[in-house]
Amino acid sequence: MGEIVFTEKQEALVKESWEILKQDIPKYSLHFFSQILEIAPAAKDMFSFLRDTDEVPHNNPKLKAHAVKVFKMTCETAIQLREKGKVVVADTTLQYLGSVHFKSGVLDPHFEVVKEALVRTLKEGLGEKYNEEVEGAWSKAYDHLALAIKAEMKQEDSQKP
C-alpha cells in the first residue's frame, strides 16, 4: 500500500474531537457499544463481556477499555497517517489484534458496523462541533486501521494447519 495523504487539518480534527470525547469515557463507551448492538444485535455474542447480559452493562471495565482502545487507536492512526503516510502499529500489537479478531470470527462487515457506531458516537459526543469534515477524518483513519487489522487476520488465516 502506497503513502496515504492525511492532512494536518484532518489530524487536528481527530485529535480535537478525541479530547472532547475523553472527558466522559464511561458515557461514550456505553453509547458506542449500544450503537453496535442497535446496528447488529447478533454482535453481542462476539464480545465476552456482553454475552451473558441482555443490555450493555453500565460499569463494565472491559467494555470501557475496549471502546477506549478503538477510539485511541483510530486517533493514533490519524497521527501516523499524517506523519508517515501509513499505519505504523507495533508488529506485535497488530499481530495480536489480527489474531484476536480472527479467533473471534470477525468478518469484513463487522468492521463497517464498528465504523458506523464510531460515527454515531462522534455525532452524539461532539454535538454542534460535529460535521462532515470530522466524520471524514475519523472514517479515513479508522478505514486504514481496519485494513491493517484485516491484513493481519488474513496472515493468521493463512497460517492455519
Swiss-Prot record:
Pfam families named in the record: Globin (PF00042)
Organism domain of life: Eukaryota
Subcellular compartments: Cytoplasm; Nucleus
Domain Globin residues, every copy: 5-154
Main location: cytoplasm
The keyword Iron-sulfur is assigned to this record: no
The protein's Enzyme Commission number: 1.7.2.-
First-level EC class: oxidoreductase
CDD domains with a match to the protein in the record: class1-2_nsHbs_Lbs (cd08923)
Cofactor binding description: Binds 1 heme group per subunit.
GO cellular component: cytoplasm; nucleus
PANTHER family reported for this sequence: LEGHEMOGLOBIN-RELATED (PTHR22924), NON-SYMBIOTIC HEMOGLOBIN 2 (PTHR22924:SF92)
Role: Phytoglobin that reduces nitrite to nitric oxide (NO) under anoxic conditions (e.g. during flooding or in waterlogged soil). May not function as an oxygen storage or transport protein. Has an unusually high affinity for O(2) through an hexacoordinate heme iron because of a very low dissociation constant.
Subunit structure and binding partners: Homodimer.
Protein's name according to its UniProt entry: Anaerobic nitrite reductase HB2
